[in-house]
Amino acid sequence: MVTSRAGEIAQSEIRRNNLSRMLSELHLRGPLTRSELAAILRLNRSTVASLIAELAARGLVWERSRDKPAPQPTPGRPSPVVEICREGPAALALELSTDWIRAAVIGLGAFVAVSVSKDLSLASSTPEQAVDEAHDLVGPILARLDHGPRVAAIGVSAPGAIRAEDGYIYHAPNLGWRDVPLGSMIGSRFADLGVPVFVGNDAHLAASAEHMRGSGRGTADFICLWGEGGIGAGIVVGGKSLSGAAGYAGEVGHMAVDPEGAECRCGSHGCWETEVGEEALLRRSGRDPKGGSAAVADLLEAAGKGEGGALAAMAESGRWLGIGIAGLVNVFNPSRVALGGLYARIDPYAHDALVNELDCRAMPAPRAMVELTTASLGADALLLGAAELALAPILRDPATVPLPGDAAAISSRRRARPPSYGWTLTPAEARR
C-alpha cells in the first residue's frame, strides 16, 4: 500500500513537471505542433495529447489550424498548432522609475493586452504617493479587459536594494526611499484584485527578460547593465540569475572606483554611479544635473547633430563605463554584456571610448570571450521582466490554475480563434 501510494505521488510529480515543461516551451517558443512538442519534450504522442488537453482545460493553451502552410508540406490534413491562450491568466506589470510609471497587462507568451504610462518624478514623491499614482493609472486599463485575459498576479519593477522574499526596499538612493515595504503596500492598495504581488529590482528583471527573449538569449553567462538615473546589473551565471543571499546582488553602481571621488546618494564616495549615472553625464555636458529624461533627450539630440560638448560628455561616460565593465568581465567571465536603458541610448556616442577602456583593463582571456551589445527589448524589458516574475509560479506548476467547471466553455475555448486585441512583443517591435 505504501509503495503504491509512493508510486502515485511520483507519477503525479512527473506529470506536473511535464505540464510545466510544455507550457514553458510554448511560452518561450510560440506556437508548436504536437509533433514538434513531442520531439522537444521527448515524450510520446499520447502523453503530449493528454498534457495539451489538461493545459487547455485550465485555460492556458488552445489548438488552432495553421495560418500558413508548413515549410515542408506533408500528405494529409495540416497539423494544428498549440499556442498560449490569450484569454488565460496574465500579470499586471508595473514599472516604477525615477521619471515615470508604466503599467501593462501581459499574458503568457509575452502577449501585451494593454499598456499605459505617465511621466512623474518619483524622486519627488513619497512611496505612498507613488503607489496611489500607480493604482489610479491602472484602473482604466483593467476596465478594458472585460473579455480579455484575467490578472492572476502583480509584478513590480523598482530600482534599489529589494528583498526578494517580500518586496521590501531596503534602500533606493535614486528615489530617496529607505525601508519601504513596497510589496505589502501594493498588495493593500490593489486588494480588490485579490492576487499575489512580486517585486523585483529593475536591473534583475531587465536581465531576466533579455536572457529569455532578447540580447541574452542562448547564453548561459550574461550581464545586463541597466539604468536611468543610476546603474545596476542583472547577472546570469550558468543559466541562473545571481540574486545573492537576500536578493540584493547586482548593485554595481555602488562599487567604489574612486575613494576620493564625489559623494554618492547612497552616502559613500566615489561610487561607479557618480561617474556613469545620469547626473554625471548631464553635468559634464553643461546641463542641469537634475534635468532628468528631458535633459537627456536634449543631450542626445545635440550629440546627433555633432555638438562637441555633448560628444565629449558621452565619451567620458563611455570611458568610465569601460572601467567598470572590465571589472565585471574579470570577475564573472560572461559571454555577453548588454547595455540597457540610458546606456543603450548613449552607446552610439560612447561605444569607442568604452571599448578602448575595456580592452586596456580587462584580462585578455575573458575579454576575448565577451561580446558587448545593447539590450534588444528596449524600454519594455522592465515590464516584461516584471510579468515573468509574476507568472513564474504558473509556469513552474500549471496545475495550480484551477479547472473551470463548465465543460462546454472548455470545449469552446479549445476551438476559438485568438482575439484581435493586443500584441506579442518581439525585439523588432521593441526598437520602434
Predicted regions and their residues:
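ATP-binding/phosphotransfer module of carbohydrate and carboxylate kinases, centering on a glycine-rich
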Residues: 1-78, 83-117, 123-150, 260, ...
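Short helix-capping/turn signature of helix-turn-helix
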Residues: 28-29, 213, 228
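Short glycine-aspartate micro-motif
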Residues: 81, 91-95, 151-155, 222-226, ...
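Short, acidic, Ser/Thr-enriched surface-loop or helix-capping motifs
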Residues: 107, 164, 236
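Short secondary-structure boundary segments
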Residues: 158, 227-229, 278, 341-342
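AAA+ ATPase active-site-proximal loops
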Residues: 203-204, 231, 339
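Glycine-rich phosphate-binding loop of actin/hexokinase-like ATP-binding domains
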Residues: 217-275, 423-427
